[in-house]
Amino acid sequence: MSQKAIKGYINLIIPAGGATPAPPIGPALGQRKVNIKTFCDEFNNSTKDMDKGVPLPTLITVYEDSSFSFKIKTPPASYFLKKYAKITKGSSATKKEAVVGKVTMDDCREIAKLKMPDLNTKDIEAATKIICGSAASMGLEVVGN
């Protein structure tokens, strides 16, 4: 059995249960002749058990026959960090100028465990450092050991 020829890839961040034909989904899929309604139905069906509105990075593979497959990744680290710090927005200033909230090292470790499949490391300590770096760049102070 031969594999289908790949026409291209589309990377989008789509809210869980919120795929609609409106931009950015409609235009991105329409350019590649993908059935937008079918994609929206399949995506919404596969995310129906998740909290509505959670941003999900999605990699859509489009094939030459206009069929598609998609892989849903874990939500961005910034989503989890904002949730744990109980803030709605990160700092717009550089990391040392404005601290907008705090997260604990245990929070970062917990987020790292959730994000492990999408991070480029298999070591939990390295993954925790990646998450701590994301927290610092968002203006969050990491407290604890």
UniProtKB/Swiss-Prot annotation:
Q: Which SUPFAM superfamilies match?
A: Ribosomal L11/L12e N-terminal domain, Ribosomal protein L11, C-terminal domain
Please indicate which superkingdom the organism of origin belongs to.
Answer: Bacteria
Name a single GO biological process. translation
State if rRNA-binding is listed as a keyword. Answer: yes
User: Which SMART domains does the entry link to?
Assistant: RL11
PTM statement from Swiss-Prot or TrEMBL = One or more lysine residues are methylated.
Name recorded for this polypeptide: Large ribosomal subunit protein uL11
